[in-house]
């Protein structure tokens, strides 16, 4: 009960920050972005619900409005916010097989050629005191040379304090990979929480978020489950459970509608509560070894692509392709 009260108080504090007008006074900020307001009718989509061998295509993609800059790369899709020079969200499916890294980090940060308005650059971050923090982590994209290269696009970066990026944020990324291993595949959406009065860095005025979020959906039968996180852009020694919230809570502070392609009743059930005991909290991604021999599913989607999931079923097909 004490934990729930603390969590409720923490969420209320975030909401006050968002709707009262930013987390720092003007006296402490020499550079600010103009006030940002999300239109009440801004959530729309060009993705349709598309059934393919019982799979929901593009399940990881949040609602977006017509005119939003949506960029698709090999391993992830993002919504780019030109005002703040970073993504509103980065979304991807992460399978157990993809967590087994085949390619090392390039550490070569690149301007994203697919962002029509131009992304941030290395000069924006130089001597700023902030890390070029990955939204979709490089360790999630090590399953091909292309995905690893694309994970270093500046459209996938956000200014993060070193203690946060190399500490609790990295720990959460590792935990998410553990969940992908345990559940065969999960859907991940991650990004910054934009508020009024954010400081900026560089000539392109890259906004410095005060908070970041992740939402995760396990859509593997029999135990469907979802969870969200909101973390301050600061170092922390608190356990990750302290920052766990419902997906609905993340939607309230970001204005983003996650996993909207689910049936309404199912979406409501998965997003309204957070069940921390439903998830394991010890990262095992580095030493993960399957108890069975898993292979890539031999199922083919309607688009003609081979299913990315792994399976230990004797027929070589995952549950969705039985």
Model-predicted segments: where are they?
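Domain-level detector for secreted/extracellular nuclease and nuclease-toxin modules, and
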Residues: 2-13, 22-296, 303, 314, ...
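Feature captures the catalytic cores and cofactor-binding loops of soluble hydro-lyases/lyases
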Residues: 311
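Core hydrophobic alpha-helical membrane-spanning segments
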Residues: 15-17
């Amino acid at each position: 009960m004490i934990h729930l009260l603390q969590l409720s108080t923490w969420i209320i504090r975030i909401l006050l920050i968002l709707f009262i007008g930013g987390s720092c006074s003007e006296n402490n900020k020499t550079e600010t972005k103009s006030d940002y307001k999300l239109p009440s009718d801004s959530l729309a989509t060009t993705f349709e619900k598309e059934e393919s061998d019982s799979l929901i295509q593009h399940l990881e993609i949040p609602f977006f409005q017509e005119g939003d800059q949506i960029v698709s790369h090999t391993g992830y899709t993002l919504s780019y916010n030109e005002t703040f020079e970073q993504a509103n969200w980065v979304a991807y499916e992460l399978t157990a097989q993809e967590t087994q890294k085949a390619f090392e980090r390039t550490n070569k940060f690149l301007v994203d050629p697919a962002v029509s308005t131009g992304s941030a650059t290395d000069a924006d971050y130089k001597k700023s005191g902030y890390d070029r923090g990955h939204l979709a982590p490089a360790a999630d994209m090590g399953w091909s040379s292309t995905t690893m290269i694309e994970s270093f696009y500046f459209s996938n970066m956000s200014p993060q304090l070193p203690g946060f990026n190399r500490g609790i944020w990295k720990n959460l990324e590792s935990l998410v990979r553990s969940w992908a291993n345990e559940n065969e595949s999960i859907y991940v959406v991650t990004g910054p929480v934009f508020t009024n009065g954010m400081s900026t860095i560089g000539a392109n005025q890259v906004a410095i978020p005060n908070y970041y979020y992740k939402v995760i959906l396990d859509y593997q039968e029999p135990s469907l489950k979802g969870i969200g996180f909101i973390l301050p852009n600061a170092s922390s020694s608190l356990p990750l459970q302290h920052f766990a919230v419902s997906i609905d809570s993340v939607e309230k502070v970001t204005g983003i509608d996650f996993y909207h392609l689910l049936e309404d009743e199912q979406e409501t059930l998965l997003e309204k509560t957070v069940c921390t005991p439903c998830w394991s909290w010890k990262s095992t991604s580095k030493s993960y070894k399957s108890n069975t021999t898993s292979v890539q599913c031999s199922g083919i989607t309607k688009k003609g692509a081979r299913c990315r999931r792994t399976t230990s079923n004797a027929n070589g097909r995952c549950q969705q392709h039985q």
